[in-house]
Every structure is written in C-alpha cells, then in structure tokens.
Amino acid sequence: MPKILIVEDEINLRDVYSSRLEAESYTISVASNGEEALAVAVRDRPDLILLDVMLPKISGFDVLDIIRTTPEIAHTRVIMMTALSAPKDKERGEKLGVDKFLVKSQVTLEEVVSTIKSVLDSSAAATTQNEQVLGSTGTQRSASASTAEPAAPAPPANQPPANQPPAN
C-alpha cells in the first residue's frame, strides 16, 4: 500500500487522519513540524504528503518549496490542508507545486480520504503511462539497434543511385 506522511502540529487532527488512513490500509508516518517533515520525507520517501501550512519551525509553504527542490523527493505528491482560505494562499501553494490545496473548514474527513485516493490514483496512472512509453521506446531502440544496417551514403547530387541505370 502507498505510504503517506501526515504533517500536522495539532495532535488530535494528526491522530484522526492517521487512524482513518490506516483503516484504508495506507502505511502512515507522522511529523509535527516542518523540520521533522523534511527529515521523515527524505528517510521514508512517502508516496504522498498531507501537509499543514501553519507549522512550527518551518511553514508548510517553505516545506513544499524545499521538497520541490530536493531531487530525492521532488516528485512526491503533496496535499496541503490548512485553515488559510484566502485565494492568495491557494495561489502560493499552486505556484510552489502543490497537487491539491484543501481548506480544513471546507472539507470532511471522507473528502480528505477521497482526495488522497484521487491524487494517488492519478499519480499511479501517470507512472504506468510513463513506464509504457519508456518501455516501448526502449524496446524499439534495442530492436532497431540489433537489426538495423548502417545507412548507405547518399549519392552525389548529380548522379543517380548506384542500383539504377543513368537516364539518357
């Protein structure tokens, strides 16, 4: 099952999210601040991070910015969960590369679970599609490399190809 890192400084919310997602058979790790989140993300390489914005030590926005510039975890899916509901906050998250931006007061726990499934499903579909493209490309390359003959040099501009008689 996919691994999810829950980054939430509010212990009750962290416990609720953890319990609910474990019931869906996700493997859960948790962090209570931005600094810890980055360490756990690099160590555990989660498939998805559920990230609060207002965190101690390093804000969720700064955590996301660091995630997107850290090669080992740059492609990790991130859902921001926050009390911030201003459009500028959502825009900031989108500019930093968040996959989904949810306002805590506007979603139920079941909507959070549904969003997580949707983001993970789209991630899996994209991975499968990329593997198919790479796989078929790799197969074509290896097949053509083993069976292709070197191309014959082009004839000079004023001469017909060698296998055709000259025109009179």
Q: Residue ranges of each PLM-predicted region?
A:
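Conserved acidic carboxylate
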Residues: 8
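Two-component/phosphorelay signaling modules centered on CheY-like receiver
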Residues: 11-29
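The short loop immediately C-terminal to the conserved phospho-acceptor aspartate in CheY-like receiver
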Residues: 27, 53-55, 79-80
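Acidic catalytic/metal-coordinating carboxylates
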Residues: 33, 59-62
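Short amphipathic alpha-helix used as the core "switch/output" element in two-component signaling
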Residues: 39, 61-74
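Alpha4 helix (beta4-alpha4-beta5 surface) of REC/receiver domains from two-component response regulators
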Residues: 62, 85-102, 106-114, 118
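CheY-like receiver
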Residues: 121-168
